[in-house]
Every structure is written in structure tokens, then in C-alpha cells.
Amino acid sequence: MRTCYTGQVCRDHLGQTVTLYGWVNRRRDHGGVIFIDLRDRTGLAQIVFDPDNAEAFGTAERLRNEFCISITGLVRLRPEGTANAELASGEVEVLCQQVEILNASVTPPFQLDDDNLSETTRLTHRVLDLRRPQMQHNLMLRYRVSIEVRKYLDQLGFIDIETPMLTKSTPEGARDYLVPSRVNAGYFFALPQSPQLFKQMLMVSGFDRYYQITKCFRDEDLRADRQPEFTQIDCETSFLNEVEIREIFEGMIRHVFKVVQDVDLPTPFPIMSWTEAMQRYGSDKPDLRVNLEFTDMTDVMRDVDFKVFASAATTAGSRVVALRVQGGGEMSRSEIDAYTQFVGIYGAKGLAYIKVNDVAKGREGLQSPIVKNLHDAALAELVKRTGAQNGDIIFFGADRAKVVNDAIGALRVKIGHSEFGKKAGLFSGGWKPLWVVDFPMFEYDEEENRYTAAHHPFTSPKDGHEDFLESDPGKAVAKAYDMVLNGWEIGGGSVRIHREEVQSKVFRALKIDAEEAREKFGFLLDALQYGAPPHGGIAFGLDRIITMMAGAESIRDVIAFPKTQRAQCLLTGAPSEVDEKQLRELHIRLRNVEVK
């Protein structure tokens, strides 16, 4: 029976006989003495095989990388000068008395310490990839975070309740993953995009504090921070307002960071309205580590001769912003061209700029092809508003507000994170949390000529905004809030609608008529009529949180068996074809299938 894990062997075990299990990480033959590094999920221990123990030594000669073995031996100090300070077990070694090969291994397709493996190779051989210390660290970190979340919520009276994985498809949100019903021919379940409706009905049922750590599913195009199946810390409460809800879950995140990583997050988290975030940063999830902000110049540029600025400044739904970069006047033409190409990804047609050489000289101290098209009053106001100093550069965005926000917002982050930005003090590092509140309830879809829910259609309007649901939905502000950390949205929630008549108004604003609302959400509308309490909640993306805490490059590095950006599992070959018999049982016939 194992006495301890390999990474736990230390001076405390000196003179003791231990039994260890694990995998051969490396084998070395030094002058007749064989050494192996034995590895398990806790770390390494050095095992010594002396030729005086002929049986154990003979077995050791057959060992190769990734053999699974057990050893029993005596813990002793390593010889003087051979200690390894990088290992927890680095002061000691185990003199093997007995060794058993539990299972041999074929030659692995790669060395576990190879840092240049392609992601395809790693995901295809995920079983071996997960043996790598960094991956084991990531999954242990994930486990520890989950444990601390549960401890925190349990202490506050939250109840872990499971909700269905097979549920009803609804028209709002991302594409559903559909599951055909064999018993009910022609009908389909959907895998849940979130437990949203079930947790609201749990509130109606009287379970006033609910949570679960659960899988959710969305059939959408993947990005670096997205997976078709992802894990959510899902929470809901009754009888609390949005401020009280934020306090509870801010406390949860602070607790997790302190206990797991010994990081003290600020108290309290700053709060910013959605409108302010978009005005200052062009993003509803601003990275506050970057010390750069927009300066709105729309009102100043209405009468300038530069048509790009004047047109944007006088067109509804457009804006002109300036981004002052301290010390950026030293940027080369090639660097500016690279940034111009970068903002083009976000729809910007160009990137105007002005270099500030000498503020005291006014127009003559400013360097740019566009200076001649801006009158003196506009230039003076630009310098005043931005606080520009000698040696700065000012970039501009002038277009539809969405293009400006996306392009210059991304430029802000790119410059801040660049080598230049860090040297110039434009990036402060650390952890910068933020609550973004007061989101619009609706976004207008030009193609469909209707409003869509900015979060989801069950979010409550702010007090005094209920009348806008019928008169002017675009003005309605929601009791919604997102928790943002270092430019990532790690959690989002809202106070929910708990009155049936208000929910029906929201459906009408979304052009969901009474018949469709009854068909899709009748169970919710009915539940709200039985004394539904005021309630609200939040959901956190566990995968995102772990990615940040681990400093991982991809969300796939913190999930045991992730999908690729084509939503495939390279380990198992999923998704895969199924045989005709299975399809017939499900009453499904395939047609016009394009093989990719």
C-alpha cells in the first residue's frame, strides 16, 4: 500500500521505509548505479538502484520512460552537493529494496518536457499530455477553486441542486445542441445553454439560495476563450437586490483568490456603468491594467475640413475619439503602419495620428498630414482634453460607434500590452477587477429589424424603466451586472423579472407574440403567477477563471478533454458517424451531407 506520494517525500521521512507508485520520468545509469526519477501528480522523487540488490537492479535495467511501477525503499539524504533545490523532495532519495513493473509502456510519441509540441499533437495524445506537470497543476488548481467555491457558498446557506441536461429548445441566444427523442418521434431535446429557467423556477419553489457547478452547451463558432461545452458556477438568490447580490459574489471571488493563490483583491471592486465603460474604453469589459483612455472629440470635429472626422462627428450613431499614448512620439512609421493594419481587422478604414513635438508651438509643434485640415481651436481643444505632452502620439478613431469602440479599444489594449507599453508605464499589471452595471436591456438587430435581448429576455428593467418596454425599448436599462477581471468577463448576472405581466411586455418588445411566448415559455409564465419572489443571480465561467489564475495561453489548457476550434475531440474522434440502424431508431434520415 502506498505510504505517500512521490512529491511528498522529504527530510521528515529520513530512515523510513516508503512505498511509492508512479511513472518513470527518466532513467540514468551512472557508473553501475541506476537512478530513476519517479513521477506522480505531486512531483518527482529520485530512486536509487544499487547492484548489491541484484533482483531490483535487474528490473531497473528494463525500465524505460512511462513504465508504471511501484517501489519500496529506504529514504536517505542525497550525497553532499547533489541536492536539487527545485524539487520538494530534492534533499533526499529512496534506496530501492523492491520494485514491480505494473505495466510497461511503448515508446511515447513525444517527450513530456518538450515545450514545442503542436496543439494537435497534444490533444490527439491527451492522455500523455495530461501527465505533464503544468497540465496536472492546472487541473489541480481547477479542483481547488471548485472546492473553495463550494465551501464559501455552503457557509452562506446555498444549496447545490442539479437541473436537467435534457431540456426544451428556446428561440433566444446561441444555437442549441439538439438531441433527438427516440420515444417521441420527430421531437427533440436541447442541451442547456444555461440552467437559467430552471434556477428561476427553483426560486419560485422556495429554494432561496441555489448553486451548482455545471456543464452548459452552445453550438457557436469557437474562439480562444470558447468551448462548445463549458463549466459554469451557476447561482441564484431570492429577496436580495442587485447590490446585495454583487456583495456576496464579489466576496466569493475574493475568497477564492486569497485561499488558492494568496492574492488580495481590492475591497470593494470599483463599479462603472456600461455607458461610461464604452465612452472611456470602447469596451464593456475594459482591461484596467492598461493606463490609456479614450478622449471623446466628437463635438469638436464637426466643423473641421478633414472629412473623415467631420462626417463621423455629424452622423448619428458615430463618434470621434482620441487615444493619447504617452511617449509614443518615438514610434516609427513601420510601427504605426502595423497598428493601422491591426485596427483594420475591426473594420477601421485607417488610423489617423498626430505626433506632439512641442506643445508650446501650437500648430507648428504638431506633426501629421491631417494637421493642416484641423483649425486652431480644434487642435487647442485636442491638446487640452487629452493632456498631451511633448513626445506623445495621439491616435484617432472616426466612424460608426461600434467600429471606433472595437478598433480603438483593441488598439488601446495592444499598445498597453506591448513591449513599448510596459516600458512606458502604460501597463500596471496585477489584478484589476471591475463591476460593469446598467447595461441596455436590448440591442437593435438591423438585419432582422427588431430588438434582441442584450443579456437574456428574463432580465428585469431598472426601476422607472418598465414603461420603456412598450414605448421605446432602446431606452430601457437593465438591472444587469458583469464582473470583469483584467479585460475578461468572468461572470454575468442580473435581477430577474418576477412578475408575469412584465415578462410578457419584454416578450412583446422582442416581437415574440403571445402564442409563441406561451409555446416556448408557458411553464415560466405560469410559474410567475404563483407568488414568485423577487430574485436574481449570476453565473461565472469556471474555465475562464482557471485560465487566468493559471496564466494559461488557452482555455483548452485548463480543461481535461477539450474540443478544438472545429468542435472536435482529437482523442476520441468525436463527433463521429453513426450507423444507419441508430438513425432509423431515431427516425432521422441524412441528406445532402457535405463531408469535410
UniProtKB/Swiss-Prot annotation:
Q: Does the keyword Protein transport apply?
A: no
Q: Which residues participate in ATP binding?
A: R218, D219, E220, Q227, E489, G541, L542, D543, R544
Where L-aspartate is bound, by residue? E172, R218, H455, R496
Subcellular localization is given as: Cytoplasm
Indicate where this protein is primarily found.
cytoplasm
Could you tell me the EC number(s) of this protein?
Answer: 6.1.1.23
- Residue span of region Aspartate: 196-199
Cellular component per GO? Answer: cytoplasm
Q: Molecular function (GO) terms listed?
A: aspartate-tRNA ligase activity; aspartate-tRNA(Asn) ligase activity; ATP binding; nucleic acid binding
> What is the role of this chain?
Aspartyl-tRNA synthetase with relaxed tRNA specificity since it is able to aspartylate not only its cognate tRNA(Asp) but also tRNA(Asn). Reaction proceeds in two steps: L-aspartate is first activated by ATP to form Asp-AMP and then transferred to the acceptor end of tRNA(Asp/Asn).
Q: Describe the protein's quaternary organization and the partners it interacts with.
A: Homodimer.
The Swiss-Prot or TrEMBL record describes its family as follows: Belongs to the class-II aminoacyl-tRNA synthetase family. Type 1 subfamily.
Know the name of this protein?
Aspartate--tRNA(Asp/Asn) ligase
Instruction: Name the species this protein comes from.
Output: Bordetella pertussis (strain Tohama I / ATCC BAA-589 / NCTC 13251)
